[in-house]
Amino acid sequence: MGDIEKGKKIFVQKCSQCHTVEKGGKHKTGPNLHGLFGRKTGQAEGFSYTDANKNKGITWGEDTLMEYLENPKKYIPGTKMIFAGIKKKSERVDLIAYLKDATSK
């Protein structure tokens, strides 16, 4: 299991410019991530997704996020997320631990 505090720092550094996590949080360039786990791709209410995201059809969980966050454009070709990915597995594990905690409160 990852370190939630380390994951929070990674989120602030690499994700928070485009995403929020709190319930009722606003969409920015990217969607609010509250309720992410167990939700299908392209389903955050009120956010305009690419067809690539809507049509991917996977459900977000630890395994799918682990693969996606390594290389988003490879996992969902056509996504508009402008992010190169996180190559270090330990950083992805920490970020996912934080997201699992923060998006469910």
UniProtKB/Swiss-Prot annotation:
Cellular component, GO, one term: mitochondrion
PROSITE patterns: CYTC (PS51007)
Subcellular location: Mitochondrion intermembrane space
Modification after translation, per record: Binds 1 heme c group covalently per subunit.
GO terms of molecular function: electron transfer activity; heme binding; metal ion binding
SUPFAM superfamilies noted in UniProt: Cytochrome c
One of the GO biological process terms: mitochondrial electron transport, ubiquinol to cytochrome c
Keyword tags: Acetylation, Electron transport, Heme, Iron, Metal-binding, Mitochondrion, Respiratory chain, Transport
Domain of life: Eukaryota
Residues modified to N-acetylglycine: 2
Gene name of this polypeptide: CYC
Family: Belongs to the cytochrome c family.
Role played: Electron carrier protein. The oxidized form of the cytochrome c heme group can accept an electron from the heme group of the cytochrome c1 subunit of cytochrome reductase. Cytochrome c then transfers this electron to the cytochrome oxidase complex, the final protein carrier in the mitochondrial electron-transport chain.
Residue sites binding heme c per the record: 15, 18-19, 81
Record's protein name: Cytochrome c
